[in-house]
Regions:
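Flexible, compositionally biased loop and terminal segments
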Residues: 1-252
Length: 252
């Protein structure tokens, strides 16, 4: 029996995180160690996206969110950004058939209108073409940052207050969450970051308040199903207390 199958059997399906978020990091360093250009690392990372998406859907995860391109990534060399946009367009178009086969719904969050028009149109078409799927929602965070998300939420709330649609004293945690780009999904129970870096890099700042954080030294292009299962098993050995004591959590 392969390691991934052994690990999958150990997972408690009753305590499975419903939402996993992943910071896919290390593509450039992975490529550099092999004497290749950074774009080669991004191209090689597509297989990791396929494996993790399939593995998540297979075991029953309902939401998978991947940090694909941050607002800060626009500052990278033009050749790399152009290559990433081209890769995004090609991959999304190719993967629609596979997503439909696995009943995976595609979603996207971020300042999507900042994407090149061709990329935006292809993304919207893929979202439409997979909208009927119900097994799992795969969300790509594109031109996204946590601060951008909070800013756009604050701007929209301020506008609604000014127009009399929202009372200031009605603004609580749930209300703020409803204005974020992730309004239609639960907060992640588990955040995974690859490449050995141990920070959240402006990703889902509000939504990660109570998430468990899992860091692995593996670069994203090397991340496979077994690695995802190890992250989930690690999470299942932790106790989420939300500010309470262990005794209170156990009593509940």
């Amino acid at each position: 029996m392969e390691l991934k199958d052994q690990l999958m059997q150990q997972i408690d399906r009753e305590r499975l995180p419903q939402h996993i978020a992943i910071i896919m990091d290390g593509n450039g360093r992975w490529a550099k160690e092999r004497g290749k250009q950074r774009l080669f690392g991004h191209q090689s990372a597509i297989q990791s996206v396929r494996e993790v998406s399939e593995a998540s859907a297979e075991i029953g995860v309902k939401y998978l969110t991947l940090y694909a391109f941050s607002t800060e990534n626009w500052n990278r060399p033009l050749a790399e950004v152009s290559g990433l946009m081209s890769l995004l367009a090609t991959t999304i178009t190719k993967e629609v058939v596979t997503m439909n086969k696995n009943s995976i719904k595609l979603n996207a969050i971020g300042d999507l209108k900042s994407l090149p028009k061709a990329n935006y149109d292809q993304l919207m078409q893929a979202i439409k073409d997979t909208s009927h799927n119900t097994r799992m929602t795969l969300t790509l965070a594109l031109s996204y940052s946590g601060r951008w998300d909070l800013k756009q939420a604050a701007q929209r709330m301020a506008q609604d207050v000014a127009q009399g649609k929202l009372q200031p004293d009605a603004i609580d945690d749930a209300m703020i969450s409803s204005y974020l780009s992730t309004y239609n999904m639960p907060d992640p129970e588990l955040l995974v970051r690859t490449s050995g870096e141990e920070r959240i890099s402006n990703f889902l700042l509000w939504q990660l308040a109570y998430s468990e954080l899992y860091f692995t030294p593996k670069y994203w292009p090397d991340f496979r199903k077994a690695d995802l299962y190890e992250a989930i098993l690690n999470d299942q050995h932790r106790e989420r207390r939300f500010g309470k004591t262990s005794e209170q959590v156990t009593a509940k």
